[in-house]
Amino acid sequence: MTLQIGVIGCGAIGQDHIRRLTRTLSGARVVAVNDIDPQQARDAVTKYGLDAEIYGDGHEVVAAADVQAVLVTSWGPTHEAFVLDAIAHGKPVFCEKPLAVTAQGCMRIVEAEVAHGRRLVQVGFMRPYDEGYRALKHVIDSGEIGAPLMLHCAHRNQSVGERYTTDMAITDTLIHELDVLRWLLGEDYTSAQVVYPKKTRHASAHLADPQIVLLETASGVRIDVEIFVNCQYGYDIQCEVVGENGIAKLPDPPAVGLKHAARRSVEIMTDWKERFIASYDVELQAFIDGVRQGALTGPSAWDGYAAAVAADACVRAQQSGAVEPIAMAERPAFYRG
């Protein structure tokens, strides 16, 4: 069976997913598209040679008789309504982050999915599909380094645009760490604090950069995450787990080591899409396979809710300077196991 997918949102990430659905992945094809800018939808159909219907409204894509699953890559504030509509139609939906722009919105999706009685939602957190993170989790779960005590992490971007704001360091950048570190450790966060080092001269006037986020988990693991979105030198993701008996570190992407002119060097990537390109492929293929097999296994609506609750606390901590509690609702049995 070839899974027939409708895509809502034909911007950069939407077209990137259309590209992989059309040229890289197997078992699916795009049969319907929509974008708030109709020309973008038409351009996507032309660019990728799609035999797809262009709809004027995303809800029409969800309702289309030939659409068996939905891909939501539209503007963040529209995600909740489209995901809820897909659940109401009983159609599996892959939603790029954020699942919703508030924790309350994520909870509404959780409640709708639980009421439906079957997992239909996968959230676009791709780092759990990265080979390096998977290898790191294997080491942690094996017990080789003992119980994790501390994590030292960094999320560095070469630069960001003028529209990037201080809170986006949490909602657009740290959100990936909030998901993947919770997955690595298998436990939830209990508190967050944000501190501000000396500001880089490369940041715009309205942006606090860099920032350091301090998290604590239910078992007492302490996590520090450096967010530096104007680091200049490249795109760099770091994660070091300090255990009772040893240390495990996320590997850097493979690169050729160069010795030349009395120097030893290794190239550093500058594009986040390049750094995690394989993970994007694997996560979307997992969604396709999960729908076809009747069992989604990727990041769930509950994972989207958990990340949103933690992000809300981090934003409060940015503003208050205090240690902010992270209080989550009880996890439904539907999402356990």
Curated annotation (Swiss-Prot):
This is Inositol 2-dehydrogenase. It holds the Pfam family GFO_IDH_MocA. It catalyses: myo-inositol + NAD(+) = scyllo-inosose + NADH + H(+). PANTHER family: INOSITOL 2-DEHYDROGENASE, PTHR43593. Keywords: NAD, Oxidoreductase. Involved in the oxidation of myo-inositol (MI) to 2-keto-myo-inositol (2KMI or 2-inosose). The keyword NAD applies. InterPro entries: Gfo-Idh-MocA_inositol_DH, Gfo/Idh/MocA-like_OxRdtase_C, Gfo/Idh/MocA-like_OxRdtase_N, MI/DCI_dehydrogenase, NAD(P)-bd_dom_sf. GO terms for biological process: inositol catabolic process. HAMAP family: IolG (MF_01671). It comes from the Bacteria. It comes from Burkholderia ambifaria (strain ATCC BAA-244 / DSM 16087 / CCUG 44356 / LMG 19182 / AMMD) (Burkholderia cepacia (strain AMMD)). GO terms for molecular function: inositol 2-dehydrogenase (NAD+) activity; nucleotide binding. Belongs to the Gfo/Idh/MocA family. Homotetramer. Its EC number is 1.1.1.18. It is an enzyme of class 1 (oxidoreductase). The gene is iolG. The keyword Hydrolase does not apply.
